[in-house]
């Protein structure tokens, strides 16, 4: 691997693994509102928001940090009132109870209009227009949760990258394979990849805060209680499940707790991190081993998401747990061959799990994903692998990954449409 390629990979990871407070879809909407408000230069009197179906789906049932409320309207209101676009996915970190009350007034006065953007192919699209004093400003995010492609005030266009995105082009030229991911994680100079330890610090802290509270369905807290001893035993496996689900519980309930995200998703960041951290800590692994295992996990997720896309009908925990399965397999002493076996086992098991939006019950899916990650790693260490005569698995692990992402990005499009239709017509 050349030094240039190594630096490209590090830059890619630093773009994709970033802190986030709250579910990234409503937070990305708040970020877009903040940018439009800043461009307008005044408190908006009216805010019009147009969203792709996938953004709408992921923002309907999730808690907004620091508000005790669910859904988009309060995220939009706070983006206008206290949001700072420089904070990126921590855009709402300056929220106060007073701002929440003011935000409720904006909602009650019907100053916020949220609609589906028709006739677009983008799965991640946010368009916000803010109006005040006869002036208006527009901001558009597309392709990535923090990727602004258009900003304008009145007739003055300040940014227009709608045709081409240099950042996306750079990512496309970096062609990853599982072998390349594995080699990078094991050979990159330690000081160049030490930053990945921040994922362990932030995401473990989120889980520990969740154990102290009562968030969402409190699955993590429940698993850590009497059930852990009575049913699963006080084991590494049970701790992996409780820590991972606890962090997800807090996040989906809207706790004001930052987590380290991966590819625009906090739950993916949690699922790629905590199983690896818990396994490493409870098995006495060194700091270097933890760093390399975390890097393998997170870069595997980024690699798979390159062909899947940021949002799809496929639950993101399938991808993120595949990353953690790789990290755990390597920590168990696995070779590249066994890491590849773990990936094949994951794809054979979890492909097809639907995404029906971000919400507290995501903790259940995350727990399913990481329990399968451990199972897949154990099978791999016994040199057991789902074979190419079975279902969608190919002899070549990278082709199996492409089969997974093809199902998620193409095959499940109708599933996505039906899921959103069901979600938007409940009780009708």
From Swiss-Prot:
<protein>
    <recommendedName>
        <fullName>UPF0597 protein BF3560</fullName>
    </recommendedName>
</protein>
<dbReference type="InterPro" id="IPR021144">
    <property type="entry name" value="UPF0597"/>
</dbReference>
<comment type="similarity">
    <text>Belongs to the UPF0597 family.</text>
</comment>
<dbReference type="Pfam" id="PF03313">
    <property type="entry name" value="SDH_alpha"/>
</dbReference>
<dbReference type="InterPro" id="IPR005130">
    <property type="entry name" value="Ser_deHydtase-like_asu"/>
</dbReference>
<dbReference type="GO" id="GO:0080146">
    <property type="term" value="F:L-cysteine desulfhydrase activity"/>
</dbReference>
<dbReference type="GO" id="GO:0019450">
    <property type="term" value="P:L-cysteine catabolic process to pyruvate"/>
</dbReference>
